[in-house]
Amino acid sequence: MKYSEAVEQLMAMTEEVVPASVIAPIIHVHPSVMISQAKKGTWDRGVCNYIVSGRRVKFFRIDFLRKGGWIQ
């Protein structure tokens, strides 16, 4: 699976969620991990936090990013 395809799949599966790595690289995580973790993550003010290998990773809701001017 290409990364861009995985991102599209992730967005479709997680109610308009985009991984933070698309906007600003935090850590590299395999797309399948992002998809499964986004479903289980905790949401707060448009941000989803979860832990991968002991490191905190964030997802951001697309509308949250648009409001902040991060994406068009």
Write out the residue ranges for each language-model feature.
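Major-groove DNA-recognition helix of helix-turn-helix-type DNA-binding domains
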Residues: 26-58
